[in-house]
């Protein structure tokens, strides 16, 4: 009987240790999770973010390359996107609505590295830019 109790105790200890080890590898609930930046959905969100940045600009910027993507589940989804930008061929004041197909880069020279956080609630058709910050490419 003592052997049986010792065996059950040992199994419990091993299972508890295995459970705590696997928890450390899981993403924190509500935390940021790294995603694959080659997913076209994320590129579209980056283009959406640049399309909202018009104040004080003559031309829209456009996305050159998506560098990093993170997602966070909240009451919807937050997307944190890091990408490079340059000026596009689309003048803002002409009334042309931004699109990644129409607003091509004037050059392939990186003018800024930007980070945008976009909040979406798909089932309520909500999408908005919570923050948008850019730095010179050599500052990153």
Could you describe each region identified by the protein language model?
Residues 2-140:
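N- and C-terminal low-complexity/disordered segments
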């Amino acid at each position: 009987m003592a052997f049986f109790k010792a065996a059950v105790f040992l199994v419990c200890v091993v299972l508890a240790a295995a459970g705590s080890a696997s928890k450390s590898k899981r993403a924190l609930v509500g935390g940021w999770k790294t995603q694959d930046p080659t997913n076209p959905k994320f590129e579209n969100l980056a283009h959406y973010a640049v399309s909202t940045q018009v104040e004080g600009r003559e031309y829209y910027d456009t996305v050159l390359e998506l560098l990093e993507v993170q997602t966070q589940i909240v009451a919807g989804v937050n997307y944190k996107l890091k990408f490079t930008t340059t000026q596009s061929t689309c003048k803002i004041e002409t009334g042309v609505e931004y699109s990644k197909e129409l607003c091509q880069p004037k050059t392939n020279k990186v003018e800024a590295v930007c980070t945008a956080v976009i909040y979406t609630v798909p089932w309520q058709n909500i999408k908005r830019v919570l923050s948008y910050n850019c730095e010179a490419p050599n500052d990153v």
